[in-house]
Amino acid sequence: MASYFISKKNVLEKCILCAPMVSVRANASSRRIVKLLGLLDNIGYGSFPMQKPSWDSEDGWIEEPFEDNALTTDRERFERSFKFLKKCPELGVKGITIGWLKHALKRTNQFKKIQWNIAIKRPLLLLDAMEDKLVNSHLNKELLGQSDLVEIKSLKSQHEIMMETDEIRDEAWKSIDNFLNS
């Protein structure tokens, strides 16, 4: 969405990004390993899983412990999502692949080179998940915050803001309503 919003094709008047993957949390060593493994993508092994999915060919989705999840602090919504996946297993993502990691790091590295203060031409709301373990909240704010057209709402949330507790979601929706009505 961020790529589209700053492109010449953009027809949106405003944009809301919710814990966007403008950046990812990865240290220098991890980035080097992914770059090296990314060579496997070039020879046809891009679909090789880097993360073992919680999937069993006979039993389907295997429930992960709530305490280990990096997406939400809301147990009820976490468990509801698992029940939904059990009913509709085809909608689940079965692990991160070499190809996905390679291209995610490549794209987020490109985002670091963009002059966001020039690229953003219309109002944008960044819903920032301060407790995010997947994207780099600080870097997202640093990059997108270059523009005066960006409004940043930081929330004490993990990655899936709209799957968080009612209190966090209410705060997010209030920011969205204010942004869209301004």
Segments from the language model and where they lie:
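Active-site nucleophile elbow and catalytic-triad environment of alpha/beta-hydrolase enzymes
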Residues: G95-W116
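Conserved alpha/beta-hydrolase "acid-adjacent" motif
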Residues: K133-L139
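Alpha/beta-hydrolase-fold enzymes
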Residues: Y4-L91
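Hydrophobic/aromatic beta-strand patches that form the interior of the parallel beta-sheet core
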Residues: I16, L125-L127, K153
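Short beta-strand/loop motif that positions the catalytic acidic residue
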Residues: I120, L126-D128, D132
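Catalytic histidine neighborhood in serine/cysteine hydrolases
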Residues: K141, G145-E160
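C-terminal alpha-helix
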Residues: S175-S182
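Catalytic histidine-centered segment of alpha/beta-hydrolase-like enzymes
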Residues: S157-E171
